[in-house]
Amino acid sequence: MIFERNEYTNSVFSIVEGRVNVQINPEDENEVVELKKGSFFGEMGLIAGRRRTATVVAKGECFLVETPRRAMLKLISSVPGAKKVLDTAAIYRQIQTHLTPNIEKDLLKEIVDSATIESLSAGDKLISEGDESDHMFIIRAGSMTVSKIIGGRSVILSYIPSGNYVGEMALLNSEPRSASVTATVASEVIKIDAVAFRELLSREAVLKLVIEEKFQDRIV
C-alpha cells in the first residue's frame, strides 16, 4: 500500500516502472482505476490540502518517485506548463473516480478539453434553484451547502466537502435545478459541460445506464 484513504499525507507520486491501482470505492476494493508507467497520482491532496480521497496499492513491483508538496507547489509556480498538466490529469482522474472508472480515456477527451476550473469566494452561489441545468461541478477544494426553498424560506439540506460533486443531474437531462448550491468557504470547482456529456451518453448506451443508476438518488 502506498497510501490509504483519509491519510493526511500530501506528496505526489510519479510511476517510473510498474502499475498501481487507485481504489475509488471504500466499500469495494475491486472498483479501481489502474495507472501505468508515466502516470502520476496524489495530486488531489496537493490541490485540496485535505485527506487522501482514495487508497492506492502497488500492482506488483513498482518504482515510484515521491515529490513533497512544497517542491510541487514551487514547480507549479515557476513552470506554467506544469500546472496545466496537473490540472488536466486531475480532471481526468476526478471524472473517472466520480462517474465510472472503466470509461475509455479517449471518450473523455472532448469533455476534459471543454472543462474549466473556477474559483468561488465564501457565499458565492454556484447553482441557483430553478436555473437551467447546463453544467456539473466537481469540488476540488473548499466545500458547499445544498439548500432548497421550502415554505418560502431557504432550508439547508446537506453539506458537501471537497472531493465530491454537485449538479450531476444535468448530465442526464436539461430540467431546471431542483436546489441551490453555495460555497461555504473559498472554493475551487471543475466545471463540466453537460451538453457535451449528454451527447457522449447518447452514443454510449452502457455508460448512460451506469450514470443513471449512480445518480438515481441525487437531487441537484
Regions inferred by a protein language model and the residue ranges of each:
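Cytosolic regulatory regions built on CNB/CRP/Popeye-like sensor folds
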Residues: 1-220
